[in-house]
């Protein structure tokens, strides 16, 4: 009985930690993508986060990028900042 409880607690902690990592990665990737789009550079340049797939958003409209990042206020702010030249 106690082992089941401990196992469930461990799973919850692991899930929370992985979730936070994903949020951080998403912010970094969004920032990278926004910068590439704003500078109109080669969009095949890999992101610093090691996940260049996210930069495929650069092939869409800037409004679409803002929409994709809308779930994370910080990421959205980074994108908008790059588009307006504030970063």
From Swiss-Prot:
Query: What subcellular compartments does it reside in?
Result: Secreted
Q: What are its GO cellular component terms?
A: extracellular region
One example GO MF annotation: toxin activity
Q: What is this protein called?
A: Tan_10cys
- Name the protein family: Belongs to the teretoxin C (TC) superfamily.
Q: After translation, how is this protein modified?
A: Contains 5 disulfide bonds.
Keyword annotations of the record: Cleavage on pair of basic residues, Disulfide bond, Secreted, Signal, Toxin
- Reported tissue expression: Expressed by the venom duct.
Q: What is known of its domains?
A: The cysteine framework is C-CC-C-C-C-C-C-C-C.
Segment forming the signal sequence:
1-21
Q: Which residues form the propeptide?
A: 22-27
């Amino acid at each position: 009985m106690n082992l089941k409880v401990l196992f469930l607690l461990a799973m919850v902690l692991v899930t929370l930690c992985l979730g936070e990592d994903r949020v951080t990665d998403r912010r970094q990737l969004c920032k990278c993508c926004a910068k590439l789009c704003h500078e109109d550079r080669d969009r095949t340049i890999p992101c610093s986060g090691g996940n260049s797939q996210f930069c495929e958003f650069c092939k869409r409209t800037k409004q679409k990028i803002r929409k994709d990042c809308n779930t994370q206020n910080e990421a959205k702010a980074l994108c908008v900042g790059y588009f307006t030249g504030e970063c």
